[in-house]
Amino acid sequence: MDEGILARLITFTEDVVLCIVLNDGRKMITNGKKILAGKIEGELASFILSASKEFLEDKKVGVKKFKDYDIYFERIDINKFLKSIGGEFVKNTITVSELLELIKKEDVIIVDTRSPREFKEETLPGAINIPLFLDDEHALIGKTYKQESREKAIEIATDIVEKSLKRILNEAKKLDRDKLIVVFCARGGMRSQTMALILQLLGFKVKRLIGGFKAFKHAVDK
């Protein structure tokens, strides 16, 4: 399962259906009521949305045909999915509910690794901002991803991180080493993973928020 799908799945709290157009690899995630993620549109999207309902009710896996398309459907049990993810992806991670409980019980430093613009718009209560990418850098990476390729965007991001290490390290020096640090980004993806690695190498106790800011918003806005 690719990182993009993983990043989306870990933001949900209820079972969803993963749908893949086998002809071209396009993906969509739905809860049977609306499209939660994916770029499929038109009649095909409407068919997938309607067909996905039976996989939430009865079937778990199956393939359906719509015109010239073969679509794979798989119900994802979110609770089992989160428990089953292993290895480095979930090492030293924390869920939203665990973070909320942790805040009540002990001192914790919450670090928002998103861009300054994202941080100013909205963040977690009490969070401080140590951005992996500054506003113009974040915009450049996003533009490159959309207009050129994922590989080129990653190449640019890697170069930026290398040049930004001094800035990040200077900010990290201000953190209290006796406190647990929880880092997050938009979806719990590359930015928070990278920042967590940097802080761990510096000897800090670090946990990464699963699902990032989106998961937190979803939980508190229910």
Swiss-Prot record:
Pfam families in UniProt: Rhodanese
BP terms from Gene Ontology: tRNA wobble uridine modification
CDD domains in the cross-refs: RHOD_YbbB (cd01520)
InterPro entries with a match to the protein in the record: Arch_SelU_Nterm (IPR030818), Rhodanese-like_dom (IPR001763), Rhodanese-like_dom_sf (IPR036873), SelU (IPR017582)
SMART domains listed in its UniProt record: RHOD
PROSITE patterns registered for this protein in UniProt: RHODANESE_3
SUPFAM superfamilies, sorted: Rhodanese/Cell cycle control phosphatase
Example GO molecular function: tRNA 2-selenouridine synthase activity
Rhodanese domain ranges (all copies): 104-221
Protein name as it appears in the record: Uncharacterized protein MJ0052
